[in-house]
Amino acid sequence: DYCRAHGIEVVGFCPIGSPERPERDKMPEDIADIELPELKAIAAAHGVHPAVICIKWAVQRGASPIPFSLKEKNYTMNLKCVTEDPLTEEEMETIRSLDKNNRLIKGHVFLWEGAKDWHDLWDEDGVIVK
C-alpha cells in the first residue's frame, strides 16, 4: 500500500521463493507456498502448477514478479497466466490469508561483515533500521 501511494513499482524478485534452493539457504521451519494445500487446490481448479497461481496473484495485486525458469514451457505458462483465467476475489482472499511473512530466500549469502544473521536484512516489523 505504501509503495502504491508513493508511485513505487513493486517488483517480486524470485516470487516463488526458490523451493529448490541450496541446502545452505534452507531452515527446518521453512514452508514453500507452493506446497500449501489451499494453494494446490486453487491451482488444481485452474489446471496449472501452484507456482503459476503465485505469479497470477502477484500480478493481480499490481506487482511485477520476476519468475525464474530454465524451461521455455514455463516462460510461456508464466506469460499466459497473467493474461488468462484471472483468480476470483474469493481465491485472492484465500491466498492473502495464507501469508505468514515467510521468506525462502532470506539472504544468508548477502550478509555483510558484522551482521548477526539474516534478520538484519529485513524490516520484519515495518520499521526501517539505519
Q: Positions of the model-derived regions?
A:
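Beta/alpha (TIM)-barrel catalytic core signal, keyed to glycine-rich beta->alpha loops juxtaposed to Asp/Glu
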Residues: 1-130
